[in-house]
Regions:
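Residue-level signal for inorganic ion chemistry
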Residues: 27, 124, 153, 211
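SAM/dcSAM-binding transferase cores
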Residues: 201-246
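Conserved Class I SAM-dependent methyltransferase catalytic core
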Residues: 16, 148-204
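SAM-dependent Rossmann-like transferase core, predominantly class I methyltransferases
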Residues: 2-36, 42-55, 210
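Mobile active-site "lid"/loop adjacent to the S-adenosyl-L-methionine
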Residues: 125-152
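A generic structural signal for alpha->beta connector loops
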Residues: 8, 57, 83-85, 164, ...
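General small-molecule cofactor/ligand-binding pocket signal
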Residues: 12, 61, 87-89, 191-194
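Conserved SAM/SAH cofactor-binding pocket of Class I
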Residues: 29-101, 111-134
């Protein structure tokens, strides 16, 4: 798969195990932002760049354990208009800085950075739990929960998310119940849920979810459709992606 050009930036992806896909585009267009944003499993840098574009004052940090992906993501960032506000770090979430005590930081970019925490975290996480491994070890690492179990993901988010922050993720329908259950065990509350259908007659194939450390009202839940009956992008899909697609 070749390069992927958006309105304000371009994604080179020949050295990345996971290419630009619908899930990343949806999450980058939907997730809640903040002053300081963390993208867990940043891959090509797509979601990091989308968040930087949507939130012009935000500082964005993307982390990934694949050195090749991080190298290419840095190149994508440097070729973008957002190079001064996006940083790519090569490390595991489990080894990334911040402490649980730091989550009480003031809700300013300076206060959050000083404490090593974020007021918005996003992730398109590994989701294959019990399926056959791909012979490509890097693609396996990017897609299977072996490299980042859901519980480890939520433990990292709990450590790095400010008290008033929001964590947003996208997962396939078949693991959404397990994902939400793991969040509850770590003390998170589901505050927003969006099921996404490919076409109207189908069941949702994926869910976008937002979590907080305390209950937020009103709770939002809805289902959207990506394609209309003519096979074109739906009004909803066009609206949330219009800043990005040419």
């Amino acid at each position: 798969m070749g390069n992927f050009r958006f309105k304000q930036f371009e994604i080179e992806q020949d050295r990345c195990a996971m290419k630009v896909g619908t899930d990343g585009v949806l999450l980058g267009a939907w997730a809640q932002g903040g002053c300081r944003i963390l993208d867990i499993g940043s891959g090509t840098g797509l979601i990091s760049l989308m968040m930087a574009q949507r939130f012009p004052e935000a500082e964005v940090v993307g982390i990934d354990m694949d050195a090749d992906a991080c190298g290419q993501a840095r190149e994508n960032v440097m070729a973008s208009p957002f190079r001064d506000r996006v940083e790519i770090v090569c490390c595991r979430l489990q080894d990334f800085g911040g402490t649980s005590e730091a989550a009480e930081a003031s809700e300013t970019a300076e206060g959050l950075k000083a404490a090593g925490v974020f007021d918005a975290i996003v992730s398109n996480p590994p989701f294959f739990v019990d399926s056959l491994k791909n012979p490509d070890s890097k693609r396996t690492m990017a897609r299977h929960t072996d490299s980042l179990p859901f519980r480890d993901l939520f433990a990292g988010v709990k450590r790095l998310l400010s008290d008033e922050g929001v964590f947003s993720a996208i997962v396939p329908a078949e693991v959404v119940e397990q994902f939400v259950a793991e969040s509850c065990m770590l003390g998170f509350y589901l505050i927003r849920k969006c099921g996404v259908k490919t076409v109207e007659r189908k069941q949702p194939k994926r869910f976008m979810l937002s979590f907080a450390k305390h209950r937020i009202s009103p709770y939002e839940e809805h289902v959207e459709t990506m394609m209309d009956s003519q096979g074109n992008r739906s009004e909803w899909y066009r609206k949330i992606t219009e800043e990005f697609y040419r």
